[in-house]
């Protein structure tokens, strides 16, 4: 009952006593004094309590009667009575008295009132024990106080706050989980009335509430926390201002002394926000201020707090308070690392609880995914993956893209987290399909990306990819049918690079299995020095295939010792790597070996971990005979149309083709698993299919696995032979090759079989029907290579009479004059395809013979050289198209390179033929350069080619296409590292060292560059700069480390060459001078790049006698062949642009029909000023621009390029001077063959212009030179100077032509130096030079 609601009595109650001056007690109650016993006192008090309980406010007489008693009960005797029951009964009486006498209290003294209420408050502690017999009376006391709001009378007291604080503390301390809701409600009523009806809440009172929200208190008494929470919710309107004042004092003014809770402000804000965000309406702006604090730790605390506020599930703070949200996002870029880390950790909860904020977070996470701190990049991945695992819809493609990027992070921990995270997503959404097809489609790229990582050099990456494949992409613990279905459709849906990576993975695992098998074989042999040396080498090889090869070596040695001592362990390992080991057996073996090596006393056993890595790599956990059978059944279902191909997102044709490709790859690594009639029957069915690729793969599988068909499966053999014969005679070229090899591999009577193919094919060759020639030529070539003893002689007549005389030396058809230097495979004419196969046949025939007794190799090399010199047009009848010539040049260069892999033929390849072959890497056709470089690298990296062929890569410095130069550099790095590693692993004699030590490439490179057709004048600075760039292209890679004083060794080689003569032309002084000049440039580069080359070389290098004569006695060559000025120019002058070769297929102007220089200023696509061309500095700039443009792409060019020049208008210029000028003579006399230095280019739209130009060209133009061009043209004698008129008509017939810099990009424009005299005169009179602008920009 509210005091204010009660009517005041007619007379004042205070001080009124009974008429006789004695205290009136209720009937039956005797006087209560200190003279009676406690029990008696309790008995009498109970009756008093009953009387007061039954009284109401309207009983005026009774109120008057019992007033003395009310005053008596408030005496010190009762308030300080030691008996708690007495105190409880008195408190109940007092509570009723306040109720009865409301709104006035019968007590006038403020001190007395304070004592009474403190007394009552102390009695409320009895509420704590609900099992107490007196609990009901305590509850009655609470109920009475709450109902009447008795404590509100204390507002009149000056120090009422002490009472309220004591009350609040008491109630919060006694509340517990045994109280029912009524107790809590009465407490709430009591406290809320004090808060809401008072003049304000003091800090101490507020502390008594807020302290219950602090985590430590919250954990001790959950009920007090709940009570405080409900109280705050109920009083939010009143208490909000008090809370705001508190936080303002602490956060803004820094007055932490205002409260003992100051150090818990952030915990309190979090709890208050969770209770009711309205409690903090005025506090949030203060947090924004704190986010910008100069103290990093303070910012960190605020970020932690706001992360919880923004990230909590029901929070709408981000939308309600955008300024604070934006300010918080800014902390993602905080300078303090822990703040950025905390921000990133928050993002995970935010993404999961507030997907609508993902857009805001994406940009900030993008920046943090590139954070310099490893921990932050790692946590970005964890954040995104955690959210994605909860629900893929929570993360957008961009966020997943950040994880994708981090799979290539420089730190292993980050890469591992990214890869494992993606793998888990793939398994969850693609393999298990937990969120439907749409989600599976969203992450379908993961499988490809993870497999692409197998291309990385790090062994850790490779091992993790293997683990991911075995556990996530195709889980090895699935049943065989399910596992193979998973693999079948995975393989069909992978992109080509991922397929290659997966194939490489199986290949590496198989190779490691073979290393372990060879190690076990060595254990079976008697101990010897050779055996120990071989075993050590094998252990080092195995260690390289494990993480941390340094530590792995020790562990592998230890494992090898255990193998030597434990025969049972060896047998387990032999079973594991046995071709017949099943997947289940493999699992048992791995567990058994691990159990034997485990040490119970050593919980972390790095040795065991390393052995497990090895076992996991070699164990056949996916493929066995049962698995192959399941794969074949799946493929059969696809053929029959009963498979789930479409449902799995793969077309039946793709499934069949990919399935067979998969089987083909597995036939290399697990051939034994294929040996069953059922499998071979299915493969025979594939052989009869119309799909050429399917049939080809089936033949390959027979070739790899069919060694026992003849003895074990005669029925399969009888069916297979006629099919193979038919494929060898009339199948595709690839089928024919595989069919011949298959017959040779699996049949004992192969001579008879091959003869039945050879004889009819050799008799039916007809050059007039080239489309029917290709397959027979492939079959004949491979037959002669596989069975040289039987077919070498009959093939000789075929080669002489048909291949060379009839096919290669005749052009039966006229090529399409489309101006392109390269055409797609399907557009190449059958005749040229036949000629390419004829060249390959010559090589295969010679590779089969492996001797040069008949001098056939010399004849073949001369033929191939002639083809290179004639640019692919061997007959020189000009009937063949440019693109066909490119094909034939590539075939000829590749053929020489192939023959060089056979020692007997390498010896007879002359330096001139080697140089011609080398210049193919500078061909004008981009695709020729590209394919030739790939073939060269492939042979070098397998150590099949002699070291001199690595020198060819030096010429790649002249390639204008950045990608080609980068590829060449990577090839050099790979080759050099492989050779050095091979030398480390295989100690060898000095003679063999000459062919492997990478530094020995220097003399070959020097000799090759000295004979470069572009190097015509040994003192020309531009030409020397080209030489320097080529030398540095190679030397930069060689000089990365100064291993074994290699810098001094290379310097010594160059010095020694100056003491010899060029073996190619020992008596030609000009040739030797060029050789010595290149040596001086090399010495200049080595000395300038290394301070370590002045020491003496520990070894005296041996120079190849094929290229250099023996040093003459007493011959001293200390002459410097480059001047000091030139030396300075080479080292400190403006760097020579790399772009000196055609990046695209833009041929040089050919004899016969020549390009025209159009001087009209009306043509579009030109912005070149003639003066610019004549200005050397402008020319250099234009070359650099052209070179840069080249790096943007590759395109095809026209056969007759048109150079379009826009001349700046000048007064008094005769219009006649702007007419079309035939640049034929200028081109022959003045265009440099410096692979693009001022070379003609087709402007944008030149394909259309060319047709018009062809119509305008005077067909009776200058006659073709009497002698055709051969190879590259040398640099013009007048390079860099004005063209001399008397040189214009001189034909240039020496060297292979190089591509032009103008070929660098489609529509590129260049400033050629082929200028007609009139244009030059015009340029001299023209206005000041304008800056040349590359149209590509």
UniProtKB/Swiss-Prot annotation:
HEAT repeats lie at residues 393-429. GO terms for cellular component: chromatin; chromosome; chromosome, centromeric region; cytosol; nucleoplasm; nucleus; plasma membrane. Residues 1150-1337 are annotated as: Disordered. Keywords: Acetylation, Cell cycle, Cell division, Mitosis, Nucleus, Phosphoprotein, Repeat. Highest level in colon. Low levels in lung, ovary, breast and kidney. Reduced level in renal tumor tissue. Isoform 2 is expressed in kidney. The modification Phosphothreonine is found at residue 1208. The modification N6-acetyllysine is found at residues 1146, 1211, 1290. SUPFAM superfamilies: ARM repeat. Coiled coil: none annotated. The modification N-acetylmethionine is found at residue 1. It is found in: Nucleus. One of its GO terms (biological process) is mitotic sister chromatid cohesion. The keyword Acetylation applies. Gene3D superfamilies: Leucine-rich Repeat Variant. The modification Phosphoserine is found at residues 1097, 1195, 1305. Belongs to the PDS5 family. Interacts with the cohesin complex. Interacts with WAPL (via FGF motifs) or CDCA5 (via the FGF motif); the interaction is direct, cohesin-dependent and competitive. Interacts with SMC3. Interacts with TP63. Probable regulator of sister chromatid cohesion in mitosis which may stabilize cohesin complex association with chromatin. May couple sister chromatid cohesion during mitosis to DNA replication. Cohesion ensures that chromosome partitioning is accurate in both meiotic and mitotic cells and plays an important role in DNA repair. This is Sister chromatid cohesion protein PDS5 homolog A.
